[in-house]
Amino acid sequence: MKILVDENMPYAEMLFSQLGEVILKPGRSLTADDLVDIDALMIRSVTKVNAALISKASKLKFVGTATAGMDHVDQALLKEKGIYFTAAPGCNKVGVAEYVFSVMMVLAQQQGFSVFEQTVGIVGAGQVGSYLQQCLQGIGIKVLINDPFKQEEGDEREFTSLDRLLQEADVITLHTPITRDGKYPTHHLINKEILNSLRADQILINAARGPVVDNQALKHRLQQADGFTAALDVFEFEPEVDMELLPLLAFATPHVAGYGLEGKARGTTMIFNSYCEFIGNELRAHASDLLPTAPVPKVVLDRKWDEATLHTLTQMVYDVRRDDAQFRREIGAPGAFDLMRKEYWDRREYSAVTLVGSAQCRLKPLAKLGFQVEVSQ
């Protein structure tokens, strides 16, 4: 059995080698010739699975993507060919939410506002958007959510129209898939008209898919230099990056918002377990068994936390400025975008850290944000 695996998928070689011969390849440059004699294909979002890619894959029976997003896979084609497909919904939701929160916390410090006085507008209430909503509301931040699909499905949450959200939110964060058809297409959802309508004191964060925002229009909006702020983890034509847009962004990173070690381990184990089930193998893997101890596994608090404490704790685990600085330093080199993703550091989630304190420390909201908490006597 031959299993072709994206070389950037952590723990994959160790796990899948229990099932057959593992062949590692860079996901973005896969060709039809690479899939000759391949029984199973394990990918990430940089691999476009289409008719051209699988044209010579006569033995292919299984495709798994270790990502929450699935818009890079022609699912109808796979179904037509009798090829089983699976994804890893929700695997990276924590990492993306913590990326957004890091952007918010750093900007609050730089621009002199309190995150607790901001209204956050979340566009897209799927796995990531819903988790982010839960975290922010858990610590007392006002949230507006927009998702016409969820609303029409009968989701009982209180939804907001996109127009109202764009008017009332101080922070607008995007968490939609990329779609070009249907009732609510998201390609250039944030277009020139919308960008020009946004206030100078608003913040736009895109950690979803690059083409959700018209990058050319965003560049023109930021060139007004009126204080409007934008942070991008994804770019419209990545791995190509508009070098005129880059210096205008508050933060820029190479599509790594969901690249925390826990999230990647979850994605790998989810598709590994699906493949084991598919071939009738009883092996199963658990992400928690693969993870090392965090660099700072425990923090003791001696007083009730405040916003300064929150900033220290969250940035100790993940500070977006680290990735932003590397991105600006290295992006000019050939192949840098994918190389930064391939060599991404072992970033951890808040859950890797246990906060210890008395009942007076009021740790419960921090647990809702994702930290482990331990109330001391």
UniProtKB/Swiss-Prot annotation:
GO terms for cellular component: cytoplasm. Catalyzes the oxidation of erythronate-4-phosphate to 3-hydroxy-2-oxo-4-phosphonooxybutanoate. Substrate binds at S45, T67, Y259. Pathway: Cofactor biosynthesis; pyridoxine 5'-phosphate biosynthesis; pyridoxine 5'-phosphate from D-erythrose 4-phosphate: step 2/5. GO terms for molecular function: 4-phosphoerythronate dehydrogenase activity; NAD binding; protein dimerization activity. Keywords: Cytoplasm, NAD, Oxidoreductase, Pyridoxine biosynthesis. Homodimer. One of its GO terms (biological process) is pyridoxine biosynthetic process. It is found in: Cytoplasm. PANTHER family: D-ISOMER SPECIFIC 2-HYDROXYACID DEHYDROGENASE CATALYTIC DOMAIN-CONTAINING PROTEIN-RELATED, D-ISOMER SPECIFIC 2-HYDROXYACID DEHYDROGENASE FAMILY PROTEIN (AFU_ORTHOLOGUE AFUA_1G13630). This is Erythronate-4-phosphate dehydrogenase. It catalyses: 4-phospho-D-erythronate + NAD(+) = (R)-3-hydroxy-2-oxo-4-phosphooxybutanoate + NADH + H(+). NAD(+) binds at Q127, V128, D147, T176, D233, G258. Disulfide bonds: none annotated. The keyword NAD applies. The active site is at R209, E238, H255. Belongs to the D-isomer specific 2-hydroxyacid dehydrogenase family. PdxB subfamily. It comes from the Bacteria. Its EC number is 1.1.1.290. The keyword Endoplasmic reticulum does not apply. It comes from Vibrio vulnificus (strain YJ016). Coiled coil: none annotated.
